[in-house]
Amino acid sequence: MIDNKINEDEFQEPFVFKTDWKNAFNDEEFVKVFSSDILENYIINKRWYGGKASTLKYIEVVDFFKISSKDNTYFGVLLEVNFKEAFYQHYFMPLAFMSEEELDTNTIIAPVKMNNVDGFLVDALHQEDFRKLLFEEIIHSKGTSSKVQFHKGNKLEDKEYISSKFMGVEQSNTSIIYNNTLVLKIFRRIYISMNPDYEISRFLTERMNFKSSPEYKGSISVILTEGNITLGLMQELVPNQGDAWKFMLEEVDRIFENLNHKKIKINKLPDIDLFKRLKINEVPHEIIDWAGLSIFLRIQTLATRTAEMHIALGSDIHETAFTPTTYNGDYTVWLKNRLTYQFQNRLNILENNLHKLDGLALELANQFLDHKKEIRKLFLDFDWTKMKSERIRIHGDYHLGQVLVNGDDFYILDFEGEPESTIRDRKVKQPPLKDVAGMFRSFHYSIYATIFNNKDKYPYDQKELFQAGEILFKYFVGVFLQTYTEVAQGGNLNIGYKKEIDFLLKYCLLEKAVYELGYELNSRPRWSVIPLTGIASIMEFEKHN
């Protein structure tokens, strides 16, 4: 039993049911009370619940499965959350019924009495017995034909269960560390389709033997007539020193501190064009003196791993989900519809939030509104008949936060795709340069976040820091791009020639920056200067090329 007393003040009385726990989800009365009176109050406060911006209408139990250990019966419940705004989302919730003595947690869903037995409904992942059961089911999976299927990856050795614990802060999924060597990610938000994270992770490990992402070890799925739902993904726990976002913030902070330490004159720093490719020995010595050599070597390594990921994702000719494909009319219609809708949405948000902006952000916002016709035209100018490169499955949500630092190397993770996109859209084959553009936007963010978060630390005005930041950004892009194109083309990945590469990068960067603009305007308007600067520099590039 845990030390903390359970907080029963939230509940006046336990919910009383005639049914026993083992038959609970076959009992209409239990299901009705559970999905309304019990669950609604609980779910809206969970970190993984994605409907906070909408109004919950009702929750429905759409399916369930039973799974038992030696001592306990657990239910895996599939929920459909319906919203007043006329859409729905699906969630997975594993449930346990425990007496107070058996509880491993003080986070309870509700006190209940089942067939005269007192106890508590809890999220089963809080119970060690359940976590151990999942581990053993994956290790000993026999590929049975039951509704819930456990798969043991061919790289998973038989192991004894030793320990399990939650991994860090709970986000949109819940991750459990086993034996300090494995991670099981439980997907809370689920889709009636294979999760791309599972699909790509297994493909990269078992088909391509790709070494720069965590090894696929196993999975949990539910097999329904409508399709297979991925509930869990087990991977190796990669030794690391944190993510590349944290690493880059520290590096950029050091670089900005050097401005003062080394008495660097910002207006004398050599500038270059956006997308100008550079080998490290072509980076001017003034830039190396300011930023240091090591950051460019690390960017080279990241570019190499990114290209190797794309080569692995785009070199299978047998598995149709991963075969490279050309551009066509259908893809173009899909792309333009998606982008014109998104662009219009961002325009509306900007017009409604203009009063929150000032200074450079306001100036750039007005410039954006003045150029809306040209930007829309740029999105509509996508001519697939001129494209000679190929589309492949990509990471889809690629940024510094999706990369782990391990010594001098990097691991790439989280292949779930862009959170705002539908599951079908996440599986559409896209230009690999879309991932590259995502990383470039992340570089841009790391530079501006450093300026915003340390504004009193560097003895320069913001305008000068922005100027230095833009120069630094272009050198990061140039070194990354040189290495990426060399490695990608050397691995027979068809990304096109220079003109096409520049066009696709410009297109994807614009798409990313417009996407970010909506987020920033809604949550932190001061930061909207970051995507607005990105949009302005692409429009500038467009004017001169």
Feature-to-residue mapping (PLM):
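Short glycine-rich, low-complexity/disordered patches
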Residues: 49-60, 140-154, 358-362
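Conserved ATP-binding subdomain of kinase catalytic cores across diverse folds
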Residues: 64-68, 73-351, 400-402, 406-491, ...
